[in-house]
């Protein structure tokens, strides 16, 4: 009996290493970047379908006021990527570099918000494999800036709760976050600061070239220089929405290839139904 297998991408991943499966079945990816990442990892996919983000699509479809996500809000958000193994006593040089880059990005954004009198929200990462993870995550950020006056946003009770603040912020800043790319794909102003992990050398060792190479230079801090974050955020804030949409159109489609006029979750459902019918699985 034939069994149909499909994989749906839910998060960004660096290059795959020591992969035991060389060929993937039908794969619903965020965008075209995944094809290059698979190729660089020595993985072949029989049927790769760039469709955008499933979770983001579900959120937007259920949003009571979809237009609200385009309203300008005078606030910044920092998207946390706190992970226990990376941020709590990292065990190797790569993890330590990642941790420092993530921490320095937050510190720079925090100080920008203070100096420009702008609200800053920190969207916490859901991580519950240890009961004290969220406590350690909050402490990580408070220790980084020696302050407990931080507005943390947690989506513990609602998997989609991280989307509204990311959409409503004037600028979203991240180190290399799935959520950051999701809202970028739908036109929000987003700054990626992966370079603070150690510049080009870190990016190559971490294996994320394919995830950043199509980002416009105005949206990517590739150099190991947190001093540039202040200027880059200011420039993005000053950029008109029309200019921003024109600048990012190609990259948005490259990373989040949602078909215009069709929700990603509906597209996946339709594609699977057609495949099952044509292959006589059903």
Region roles according to the model:
Residues 258-282:
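C-terminal alpha-helical cap of glycosyltransferases
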């Amino acid at each position: 009996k034939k069994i149909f297998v499909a994989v749906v991408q839910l998060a960004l991943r660096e290059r795959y290493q020591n992969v035991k499966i060389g060929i993937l079945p039908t794969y619903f990816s965020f965008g075209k970047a995944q094809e290059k990442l698979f190729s660089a990892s020595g993985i072949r996919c029989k049927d790769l379908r760039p469709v955008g983000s499933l979770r983001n699509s579900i959120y937007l479809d259920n949003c009571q006021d979809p237009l609200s996500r385009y309203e300008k809000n005078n606030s910044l958000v920092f998207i946390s990527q706190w992970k226990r193994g990376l941020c709590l006593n990292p065990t190797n040089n790569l993890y330590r570099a990642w941790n420092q880059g993530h921490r320095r990005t937050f510190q720079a954004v925090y100080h920008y918000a203070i100096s420009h009198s702008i609200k800053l929200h920190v969207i916490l990462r859901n991580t519950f494999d240890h009961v004290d993870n969220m406590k350690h995550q909050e402490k990580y950020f408070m220790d980084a800036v020696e302050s407990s006056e931080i507005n943390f946003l947690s989506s513990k009770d609602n998997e989609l709760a991280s989307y509204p603040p990311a959409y409503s912020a004037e600028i979203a800043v991240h180190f290399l976050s799935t959520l950051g790319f999701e809202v970028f794909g739908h036109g929000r102003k987003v700054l990626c600061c992966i370079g603070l992990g150690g510049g080009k050398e870190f990016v190559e060792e971490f294996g994320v070239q394919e995830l950043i190479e199509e980002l416009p230079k105005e949206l990517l801090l590739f150099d190991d220089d947190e001093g540039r974050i202040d200027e880059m955020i200011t420039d993005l804030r000053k950029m008109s929405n029309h200019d921003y949409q024109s600048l990012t159109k190609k990259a948005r489609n490259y990373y989040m290839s949602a078909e215009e006029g069709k929700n990603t979750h509906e597209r996946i459902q339709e594609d699977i139904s057609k495949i099952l019918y044509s292959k006589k699985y059903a």
